[in-house]
């Protein structure tokens, strides 16, 4: 069977950027990597209702900066910034002996963000809404918002069926093999009474073309 490469990993360094922006030697690399995973897992669990699309981590010698991309910045910031301070205090258990800086980045259009779309479908499945209805409505909203193509897939015991299967719906174009194509990808899991259901979403936002340098040629006066 044909397998699909991760759309983000395929494009890193070409049109996509790294989510972890730091360098470490062999001695500290594994510790930093595990710490990154723990930070992401903790923030996702603690602030699930805030609609977190992405967490970027930047490191220096004595500082860790977190860029949290969220659809609901007010939920994280809290009244007078109390939410940020509370989050910093909680992260001290994971990040030892380093200053923590938290930067909140607002996701302006949650309906076209693949990760938030996947989490939205998963949340609907947990509320016993039909997977077909959840996927089709999400696709319709994204297409209305101006995306060029959307593809969704749900895998597991759909509708409580005894045999697990995968169902997909798509609209528009999704050029997965085109490196310059800006493909956003999201994954989420729904915990249902019949087990887990995996949700994948691909969103095509157009091509990212290199900027052409226009050289102005001055005509020599005769």
UniProtKB/Swiss-Prot annotation:
Q: Which UniProt keywords apply?
A: Ribonucleoprotein, Ribosomal protein, RNA-binding, rRNA-binding
PROSITE patterns listed in its UniProt record: KH_TYPE_2, RIBOSOMAL_S3
Tell me which Gene Ontology terms the entry assigns under biological process: translation
Under the cellular component aspect of Gene Ontology, which terms does the record hold?
A: cytosolic small ribosomal subunit
Instruction: Say yes or no: keyword Endoplasmic reticulum present.
Output: no
Look up the domain of life of the source. Answer: Bacteria
Q: Where is the KH type-2 domain?
A: 39-108
**SUPFAM superfamilies linked to this entry:** Prokaryotic type KH domain (KH-domain type II) (SSF54814), Ribosomal protein S3 C-terminal domain (SSF54821)
What the entry lists under InterPro entries is as follows: KH_dom, KH_dom-like_a/b, KH_dom_type_2, KH_sf_prok-type, Ribosomal_S3_C_sf, Ribosomal_uS3_bac-typ, Ribosomal_uS3_C, Ribosomal_uS3_CS
**UniProt keyword Magnesium present:** no
Q: Which CDD domains match?
A: KH-II_30S_S3
Annotated GO molecular function terms are:
mRNA binding; rRNA binding; structural constituent of ribosome
Matching PANTHER family: 30S/40S RIBOSOMAL PROTEIN S3 (PTHR11760), SMALL RIBOSOMAL SUBUNIT PROTEIN US3C (PTHR11760:SF19)
HAMAP family, per the entry: Ribosomal_uS3_B
Function according to Swiss-Prot or TrEMBL: Binds the lower part of the 30S subunit head. Binds mRNA in the 70S ribosome, positioning it for translation.
- UniProt record similarity statement: Belongs to the universal ribosomal protein uS3 family.
Q: How does it assemble?
A: Part of the 30S ribosomal subunit. Forms a tight complex with proteins S10 and S14.
Put simply, this protein is called: Small ribosomal subunit protein uS3
Gene that specifies this protein: rpsC
């Amino acid at each position: 069977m044909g397998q699909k490469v991760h759309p983000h990993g395929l494009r890193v360094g070409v049109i996509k950027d790294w989510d972890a922006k730091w360098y470490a030697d062999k001695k500290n690399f594994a510790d930093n990597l595990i710490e990154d995973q723990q930070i992401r897992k903790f923030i996702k669990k603690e602030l699930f209702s805030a609609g977190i699309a992405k967490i970027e981590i930047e490191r220096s010698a004595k500082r860790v900066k977190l860029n949290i991309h969220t659809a609901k910045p007010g939920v994280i910031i809290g009244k007078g910034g109390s939410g940020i301070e509370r989050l910093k205090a909680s992260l001290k258990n994971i990040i030892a002996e380093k200053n923590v800086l938290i930067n909140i980045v607002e996701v302006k259009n949650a309906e076209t963000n693949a990760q938030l779309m996947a989490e939205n479908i998963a949340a609907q499945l947990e509320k016993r809404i039909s997977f077909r209805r959840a996927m089709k409505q999400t696709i319709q909203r994204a297409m209305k918002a101006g995306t060029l193509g959307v593809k969704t897939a749900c895998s597991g015991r759909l509708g409580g069926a005894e045999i697990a299967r995968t169902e997909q719906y798509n609209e528009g174009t999704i050029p997965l093999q085109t490196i310059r194509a800006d493909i956003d990808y999201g994954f989420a899991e729904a915990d249902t009474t019949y087990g887990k259901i995996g949700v994948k979403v691909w969103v095509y936002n157009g091509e990212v073309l290199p900027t052409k340098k226009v050289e102005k040629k001055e005509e020599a006066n005769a």
